[in-house]
């Protein structure tokens, strides 16, 4: 698995591996998304992480597909429900978490890739708006208190990334979601161990 210690999408896969009992079957190798010399671009032409490189040299990407691959290896239906009545709500919740992570990463790259003072405040506001609307939706309809599926994993990784990169600023205005994350972390093996560093 090509990833980085700070990637929320990589964390999602590491957490899925832990929950599925597959962690010991996967080697994790660092990937530098900003280095054009990194073999990452041969493994995923988009140069994005995570990427799962299989024994035959072929690659699977992105995190949604990798998670489904591992769920399939574990017998299916463990993290992604098979029943359409629960499958599509779970995948929709995961899409909301992925969208929050996408917007947070875009905010991070906007400040990281520009000289000080050159980042676009309009772009930052657009991404911040996506994050805030996503958090508001989650605050209004909290994820499951008992589930450890694709939706809950993805939302928890999104919130963890906001804590890591934006000093937990979201917490003040989303108390119900803060409580949910604390309860999720307490019942989810591997959540603390996969925290971004």
Model-derived features: positions:
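C-terminal end-helix/capping segment
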Residues: 172-194
């Amino acid at each position: 698995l090509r990833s980085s210690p700070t990637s929320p999408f990589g964390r999602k896969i590491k957490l899925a591996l832990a929950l599925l009992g597959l962690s010991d079957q996967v080697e994790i190798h660092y990937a530098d998304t900003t280095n054009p010399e990194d073999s990452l671009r041969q493994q995923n032409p988009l140069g994005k992480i995570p990427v799962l490189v299989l024994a035959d040299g072929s690659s699977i990407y992105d995190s949604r597909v990798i998670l489904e691959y591992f769920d399939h290896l574990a017998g299916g239906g463990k993290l992604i429900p098979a029943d359409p009545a629960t499958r599509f709500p779970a995948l929709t919740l995961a899409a909301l978490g992925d969208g929050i992570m996408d917007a947070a990463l875009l905010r991070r790259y906007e400040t990281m890739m520009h000289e000080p003072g050159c980042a676009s405040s309009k772009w930052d506001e657009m991404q911040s708006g996506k994050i805030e609307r996503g958090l508001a939706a989650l605050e209004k309809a909290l994820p499951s208190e008992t589930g450890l599926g694709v939706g809950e994993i993805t939302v928890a990784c999104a919130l963890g990334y906001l804590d890591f990169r934006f000093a937990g600023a979201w917490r003040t205005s989303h108390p119900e979601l803060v409580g949910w994350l604390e309860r999720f972390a307490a019942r989810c093996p591997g959540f603390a161990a996969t925290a971004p560093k």
